[in-house]
Amino acid sequence: MKSACRKALLLAALPLALSACIKTSTEIGKDLIDQTLLYDPYTVEFPIETIHLRRADDLSGFSDTRIAIGAIRDETFGLTTRSSAFTLVPAMDTLDIGTNPQFISFKLHFEADTVSTASPGQERIFQNLFVYSLTDTLSTKETGTNKDIPHGTEIITRGIPVYDGKDSLSLEFTQAYGQKYIDALKRLGPVLIDRSEGSTINKYSDYIKEVPGIYIETDVPEGIGGRINLFNLSVLSVSSNYYYRNNNVATLTVRTTYNGVQKDTSFLFVPGEPAFYNEAEYLENNTKFYQYAFNRTTHEAPEGEAEEDIRIEGGGGLKPVIPAAQLREKVVAAIVARGGDPSKTVVNKASLILPYEMPEDLDRLDQFPKMISPTIRKTADDGTVSYAGLTDASASSENQGDLDRANQAYAPDITYHMQQVLQRTDLDTKDDADVWFLTVHSETVANATGNAQQEAEYQQMMYAMYYNNLYGGGYGGYGGYGYGGYGYGYGSYGYGGYSNYYNMMMMASMLSSMNQTTYSTTQELDKDRYYRAILNGPAVTVKNSPSCLLLAPDALRVPTFRVTFSVPKK
């Protein structure tokens, strides 16, 4: 017995003894790792001393979502305006204008989107709308948002429309202007009916040369104030996951003769179609077709260099531009000071921190862009300018340039771009790597992916299966109460039939629910809305507060570049 107890005690003590002898070594295998794979990480930050304020006037003025008209004057940026131009293209089913057509009316309608104002109380002011005929077609080569739009000086509406910022926009054109479209349809209508691919290019060109479209602008405020109005451009809306035609169209009504009978007939025109579409075919296939308006912007604020503040406005107005050469110079110096080689250095993270001070009027924060996206500006050999984003939108860890109200700053990441900048040696003479900040807005988009024909066929199949089950089995014999046909029998008009019916309808309902309208939120470049943001410039002397975690305590709240990099161990 004593021997058994002694053995048990020894066995119990053995794990303790074994564990007491275990040591963890972090050095084992160290000499087996390739030394070229070992890096030392460092984090440095430095103030950004040079920031240009440049107009983004070569952004394209074309928009496929809305038209923008209005004007705002504020004490910081002066006057900024929005005006819009677009074509009016006949829908496919409106081309037979009959004989001897007589003008009755020509009206245009747009649903309201949103408004932008510089100060409260301006949302419902009256604005005069001036509508002119375009004198030339809209160029697809010169697309800068600040470019002039050729238009006439004669008003083409009945009277001067007045808009109060509340409801949809409705315009009524003069008889003289409507007659131009009647004449165009009389001359070109018969040959425009064929809209097969490849056959309409010359027809469309002939049409827009005859009636290029319209141009809309508003009066400008004499003092501080004003409003910018946005209207939905698309003739397509989404309901139950299917596209349908809304009322964003122009309607030409004429009294004309068909087969000897005089009738009042309306003809539809789609704003901004870039070609002749077969709209009915698109709707049958539940496919969206695109429309475009050219939204022009003008600005008074001059370009210059940021000193105590950085000014950001909407449209093609002032945007901050940070020279890449400046960033590279500071980072290369930091790498060399730590014994590294810039060509072999890995950039782990690079962030541009742009702080701002809380304005006295907190409503001003609503005029800050929700996001300023870092981009680069590239010019092709033919002079075409394009902008490319620098943050990875698919990476949730990357800061896209969102407005951070808690830390009172924007802090977008440009990690991959900085890695490329380190390899450049020509930045003293080239500016294609300079960082431009553009205003971005979150847009909620309704998506239509349903197929009406497939759903109808599925419903038909379900009913066919149900009725086959209902009547194909005869009376179903005796069962329960009565003769199965109406009682609780088996496999007839009893539980079996109803059960199948409801199961099938449940499946059909499930399919239908899968085709309900879905919504997605996307980040899109916003050239239309009014923005007014004042950020801290390089000359600011305000010190950081403990509540702001992006900058070190007591650091100056100036634009700052923070970069984490790794250099190979020696």
What residue ranges belong to the model's regions?
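Secreted, disulfide-rich extracellular signaling modules
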Residues: 2-15, 21-570
